[in-house]
């Protein structure tokens, strides 16, 4: 057995926080490829709803791979995966990409499944977005399954699972919290002075966000900041995609490197609360501003309050 086979044989499921922002997802994609991807993996299944960051993660894992659902390549026909027999000469495709949800508008599922298995049997690698939609038509599970919701799940299935439908359910149930947290995070940046926004670093927590300020504590009134954010949430102002580096909050431009990972409007942010004190991260010398979203946000706030013996509040 090869080294990669021995290394992966006991791996079932790993979990990461799904970062918000293009560069952080790229970095995580590189890390996942280095830790979990084997050169012998031929079928890679990626699962998650629109706006979850699947395509960005794939670009991080497979630099240089042409994604067939790109806005710039969406009209390129025929789909390379469906046109394998026309590839001649020395240089042929090694890795194919296919977005099943998109391609089902053009091609029957069983034809897509046949093309995927044909490529795999020819020793090619196929990266399949929305793998859960095509799995019932395939004769096999993926070598590596990746689910993107609030968390990123990396699974190496065996005959007993995990199966795509269970990964899909978990991602669908959790994605709304990631979208709410990202919108609340950008809303927080929107309401603080630009000089503080520009020096803030970003971290992730369950059902929430962290803005980390290095070296010194910002001069911010957190009670007032929460009131202003809640006022905008109550107004239910729209969150609009502008370009790959900006969104519009109520028509006002705001920088954002994950512009598609948002709720449609601020009114969709449920249960928002700020921790009313900065947490001091001794190890990295940073002051942490923590926000929580979701139905259990008060429970999370209470849990943080009980942790005062372990964390420094300032």
Model-derived features: positions:
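Walker A (P-loop) ATP-phosphate-binding motif of ABC ATPase nucleotide-binding domains
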Residues: 43
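N-terminal pre-Walker A segment at the start of P-loop NTPase domains
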Residues: 2-39
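Active-/binding-site microenvironments in catalytic and ligand-binding cores
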Residues: 165-314
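The conserved Walker
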Residues: 50
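Conserved nucleotide-sensing/catalytic segment adjacent to the nucleotide-binding pocket
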Residues: 69-132
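Hydrophobic anchor at the beta1->P-loop junction of P-loop NTPases
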Residues: 46
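A conserved segment at the C-terminal end of the G1
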Residues: 55-68
């Amino acid at each position: 057995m090869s080294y990669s086979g021995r290394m992966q044989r006991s791996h079932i499921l790993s979990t990461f926080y799904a970062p918000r922002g293009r560069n952080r997802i790229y970095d995580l994609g590189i890390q996942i490829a280095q830790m979990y991807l084997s050169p012998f993996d031929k079928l890679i299944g990626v699962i998650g709803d629109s706006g979850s960051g699947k395509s960005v993660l794939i670009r991080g894992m497979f630099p240089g791979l042409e994604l067939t659902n790109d806005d710039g390549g969406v009209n390129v026909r025929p789909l390379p995966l469906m046109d394998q027999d026309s590839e001649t000469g020395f240089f042929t495709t090694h890795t194919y990409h296919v977005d099943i949800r998109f391609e089902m508008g053009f091609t029957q599922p069983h034809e897509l499944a046949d093309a995927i298995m044909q490529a795999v049997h020819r020793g090619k690698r196929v990266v399949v977005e929305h793998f859960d939609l095509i799995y019932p038509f395939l004769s096999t599970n993926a070598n590596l399954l990746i689910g993107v919701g609030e968390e990123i799940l990396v699974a190496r299935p065996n005959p007993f699972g995990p199966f795509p439908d269970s990964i899909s359910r978990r991602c669908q149930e959790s994605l709304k919290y990631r979208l709410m947290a990202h919108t609340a995070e950008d809303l927080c940046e929107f309401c603080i002075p630009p000089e503080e926004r520009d020096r803030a670093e970003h971290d992730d927590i369950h059902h929430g966000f962290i803005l980390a300020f290095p070296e010194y504590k910002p001069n911010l009134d957190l009670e007032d900041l929460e009131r202003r954010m809640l006022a905008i949430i109550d107004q239910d102002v729209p969150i609009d995609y502008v370009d790959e580096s900006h969104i519009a909050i109520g028509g006002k431009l705001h920088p954002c490197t994950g512009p598609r990972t948002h709720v449609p409007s601020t009114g969709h942010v449920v249960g928002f609360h700020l921790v009313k004190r900065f947490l001091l991260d001794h190890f990295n010398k940073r002051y942490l501003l923590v926000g929580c979203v979701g139905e259990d946000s008060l429970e999370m706030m209470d849990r943080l309050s009980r942790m005062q013996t372990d964390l420094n509040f300032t």
